[in-house]
Amino acid sequence: MGNIRTTFVKRTAKELLELHGDKFNSDFENNKQVVAEYSTVSTKHLRNQIAGYATHLLEQ
């Protein structure tokens, strides 16, 4: 069983995908850089959660 992602993580990832979807791909490392560049998240843990969820959405 995995961890449940918060609404903030899901909403932020979806918004970033809508605004900057062409910059994201199925590579987690690339998505971490994109999230760091285009969002104002304060912690590395939160950045990684958002990048992971964005990667998950793209792989579906």
Swiss-Prot record:
It comes from the Archaea. InterPro entries: Ribosomal_eS17, Ribosomal_eS17_CS, Ribosomal_eS17_sf. GO terms for molecular function: structural constituent of ribosome. GO terms for biological process: translation. One of its GO terms (cellular component) is ribonucleoprotein complex. It holds the Pfam family Ribosomal_S17e. Keywords: Ribonucleoprotein, Ribosomal protein. Signal peptide: none annotated. Belongs to the eukaryotic ribosomal protein eS17 family. NCBIfam families: PRK01151.1. This is Small ribosomal subunit protein eS17. It comes from Methanosphaera stadtmanae (strain ATCC 43021 / DSM 3091 / JCM 11832 / MCB-3).
